[in-house]
Amino acid sequence: MLPQDMDQVGRLWQECFCDPQSYADFYFRTMPGQNRILGLKEKERLISMIHLNPYVLSADGRRFDSTYIVGVATDAAYRHQGHMRRLLDRTFECLYGERQPMAYLMPADPKIYEPFGFRYIYQQFYIKMPAANTLGEYLRAAGDVGLRAYSASPADARQLAEWANDCLGSRMDVFTWRDERYYDNLLRETASDGGEVLMFYEGERLVGTAAYIAEETYEVREILAYPGYEPRLVEWLAGHLGDRAGMMLMPPWKADEAGVENGFRPMIMGRILYLESFLRLLRFDREADHLCLEVKDDLIQENNGSFRIVIRNGKAEKVTRLDHPEAGCLKVTVEMLMQAAFGQGSALQGIQPFEHIFINEIV
């Protein structure tokens, strides 16, 4: 989309998503200079759009460009006419041409995106806070958690990014790589929803961070901490925010004994784009020296075919497209491959899933 189209982009966004004005202001002051927006028009009127927000993911220490798909919207008068399909087809074409391994999104309804090859790859742990002080009182009984909390500012963005990459890189197999711009955006985003990013110190050492938003209720969107510190951050947050009903999202932490609702909820769906790039990211049986896959992709025809993967120490050393499948080639779809790689579907012979995943972005 061109700069002169942004008024129409904002109109369609609000018609479809009804965000608080403060959040819409954040998004349209921040993201259009960083992302790509594809749109369809009829008689100069924008009727459908898709936003492609760039991120860098890290898988076992290998960083790669990826795209977070948001803002998929169609004017109510033009729905069920194939406009979203056209935009997704164009998206796949563009991102395949850039050799991006995968794209991902947070679905309003997974059934909308399953026909396009998207499958769940990440579930998020949550604690639902009670309307009264139940959890806050339970945790405050533990006493002083021994941490000091500070509200982060843009001047802290670089330190936050370096710390988060160190924390996540030591514990997660797949996560969103963060830089100064990432935290500039997150600080603006949380502030637009009445929240903030907190930095937790023990003495002079940064040991954890938390990001929350707060309207009528609050939502702790993310807790990051070095091993052993998550419960103490939860104690601090519950003690300071526990008088308001809300939600905490974080790595798993025992909440059953406090009598609060908790569990995992599906959050992110992923889709393979450039298959050969994706295969180079995967984990394989360390004892194997090769694997042959015969792959089917109903939408990206270039991904169809047979591929021989030379394996060394459980990683792909070389990926070769074959003219004909070898004997013993494993027949898979891109959907099966995506789910097996992220441990969300049936296991596939020879492929070891990523176990610890952390993809928490909203936009």
Predicted regions: what is each one?
Residues L88, E93-P107, G242-W253:
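Conserved GNAT acetyl-CoA-binding A-motif
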Residues Q124-G239, P251-A255, I272-E287, L291:
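Amide-forming acyltransferase catalytic core, primarily the GNAT-like/NAT-type
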Residues R119-Y138, L224-P231, E235-V363:
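Active-site/acyl-donor-binding loops of N-acyltransferases
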Residues Y113-F118:
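Conserved active-site tyrosine of GNAT-family acetyltransferases
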Residues M1-P54, G61-Y68, L135-E180, E215-Y218:
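Short amphipathic alpha-helix that is part of the acyltransferase structural core
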Residues R36-I50, G194-I213, P353-F354:
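Conserved beta-hairpin
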Residues F64-A76, E216-P227:
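Conserved acetyl-CoA binding element of GNAT-fold acetyltransferases
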